[in-house]
Design a protein with these regions (language model features):
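Charged/polar positions on well-ordered alpha helices
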Residues: 42-43, 84, 119
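A short, aliphatic-rich beta-strand micro-motif
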Residues: 113-124
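Intrinsically disordered, low-complexity terminal regulatory regions
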Residues: 1-74
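A generic "structured core" feature
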Residues: 41, 78, 122-126
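Structured loop/turn residues at beta-strand edges in well-structured enzyme cores
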Residues: 44, 110, 126
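Regulatory sensory and allosteric helical modules in signal-transduction proteins
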Residues: 17-18, 47-48, 54-64, 69-113
């Protein structure tokens, strides 16, 4: 049975309040963000690149290359681990990682194998 555990930062309440204050969730596409994801895909040689924001229940894609969905349940988000630290979070092979090997995005389309994420941090230090 897949592990559908949410990873919660100790400052989650404050982090969510900060995220809401930006009024960016569910906003329209913006060329500036799309250029970043397109460039990341080219530089990293990966088929997928995302700018994601995590609210209480979901991972929402502000910008995306290589996927046709706009959000996932937070429990499936690799990014929930990314926001737990202030540095690069990397998974070499998701099929071998206990946290992700049963994730439906690893066992099925888009068949994620490698993941690298870096937290977006605001001026107050919230990821």
């Amino acid at each position: 049975m897949p592990d559908r555990t949410k990873v919660i930062p100790p400052n989650e309440r404050e982090r969510l309040r900060a995220l809401e204050s930006y009024e960016i969730l569910n906003s329209l596409r913006e060329d500036e963000f799309d250029r970043i994801t397109e460039l990341a895909t080219l530089l990293c040689g990966t088929p997928i690149s995302l700018i994601t924001l995590l609210d209480e229940k979901r991972q929402w894609f502000k910008s995306k290359v290589g996927v046709d969905i706009d959000e996932t349940p937070r429990e499936l988000a690799f990014c929930q681990y990314t926001i737990m630290q202030n540095e690069l979070f990397e998974v070499e092979d998701a099929t071998q990682d206990e946290r992700f090997k049963d994730n439906e995005f690893v066992t099925g389309p888009p068949d994620i194998r490698f993941y690298a994420g870096f937290p977006l941090t605001d001026a107050s230090g919230y990821n």
